[in-house]
Amino acid sequence: MALSNYVFGNSAADPFFTEMDRAVNRMINNALGVAPTSAGKAGHTHAPMDIIESPTAFELHADAPGMGPDDVKVELQEGVLMVTGERKLSHTTKEAGGKVWRSERTAYSFSRAFSLPENANPDGITAAMDKGVLVVTVPKREPPAKPEPKRIAVTGA
């Protein structure tokens, strides 16, 4: 992610701004949890997610390319929905003595936490993985009735 180009314009000609671009990009990537781009290094990232609300449910769609159902975990604890995933890579060759010439794919993991709204039904949560997209469905329930205001008598001394 390179936000600094939008702030400073094209600064390729100025070494100060080039180094500043790198520093700003590192800071932004670290803050956002973006995986390093170096080939073969594992990283932690925020999986791109959409949260969609319908009249009957909330749906969370998370991109998890290269992951299957065994690679992701969805947990609920004290009203917080935790979604984690990890993609591991194994560099294998078909024949003994084979050699990996180039390795550009990276292993990575992600972890996100979401506080459920009070109208979420935690007992009906489902999760399914299809073509590298995790879909977590949280059905809605009627929110608890708000208590009527209670008037407290004020007495004099």
From Swiss-Prot:
Keywords on record: Chloroplast, Plastid, Stress response
Induction of synthesis: Regulated by light only upon heat shock.
Keyword Transmembrane helix: no
PANTHER family per record: HEAT-SHOCK PROTEIN 20 FAMILY MEMBER
Lineage, opening ranks: Eukaryota, Viridiplantae, Chlorophyta, core chlorophytes, Chlorophyceae
sHSP domain residues: 40-155
Protein name stated in the entry: Heat shock 22 kDa protein, chloroplastic
InterPro entries, per database record: A-crystallin/Hsp20_dom (IPR002068), HSP20-like_chaperone (IPR008978), Small_HSP (IPR031107)
Cellular compartments per GO CC: chloroplast
Entry's localization field: Plastid, Chloroplast
Keyword Plastid applies: yes
Organism superkingdom: Eukaryota
Family membership noted in the UniProt record: Belongs to the small heat shock protein (HSP20) family.
Pfam families given in the database record: HSP20
